[in-house]
């Protein structure tokens, strides 16, 4: 076994498709696949044409910078273990 497909393998796969899906449904499936690929290609091309325009747009800075929030209370002081046992 060399791991490659020969023409007999491809013929068997084609026959399986005909048996599983039927001869009437195969052309419809191929048409649907072709339409899907066409739509996919057009979307990819559209995204490639939009990408340079999106990168060229200037980035606007926010109008107002808010100061950092102040903590509501001072952090708690650690309790000494010796003082905690005597209480």
From Swiss-Prot:
Subcellular location field: Cell membrane
Topology of this chain in the membrane: Single-pass membrane protein
Residue ranges, annotated region (Disordered): 47-87
Biased amino acid composition, Low complexity: 52-87
Species name: Nocardia farcinica (strain IFM 10152)
Transmembrane regions: 3-23
Known partners and oligomeric status: The Tat system comprises two distinct complexes: a TatABC complex, containing multiple copies of TatA, TatB and TatC subunits, and a separate TatA complex, containing only TatA subunits. Substrates initially bind to the TatABC complex, which probably triggers association of the separate TatA complex to form the active translocon.
Function: Part of the twin-arginine translocation (Tat) system that transports large folded proteins containing a characteristic twin-arginine motif in their signal peptide across membranes. TatA could form the protein-conducting channel of the Tat system.
Coiled coil region boundaries: none
InterPro entries per UniProt: TatA/B/E, TatA/E
GO BP annotations listed: protein transport by the Tat complex
Pfam families the record matches: TatA_B_E
Xref: HAMAP family: TatA_E (MF_00236)
Protein name: Sec-independent protein translocase protein TatA
Top-rank taxon: Bacteria
GO MF annotation terms: protein transmembrane transporter activity
Assigned protein family: Belongs to the TatA/E family.
GO cellular component, one term: TAT protein transport complex
Keywords, comma-separated and alphabetical: Cell membrane, Membrane, Protein transport, Translocation, Transmembrane, Transmembrane helix, Transport
């Amino acid at each position: 076994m060399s791991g490659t497909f020969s023409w007999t393998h491809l013929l068997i796969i084609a026959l399986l498709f005909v048996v599983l899906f039927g001869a009437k449904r195969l052309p419809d499936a191929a048409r649907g696949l072709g339409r899907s690929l066409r739509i996919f290609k057009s979307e990819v091309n559209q995204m490639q044409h939009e990408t340079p325009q999106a990168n060229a747009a200037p980035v606007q800075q926010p109008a107002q910078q808010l100061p950092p929030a102040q903590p509501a209370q001072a952090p708690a002081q650690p309790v000494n273990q010796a003082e905690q046992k005597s209480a």
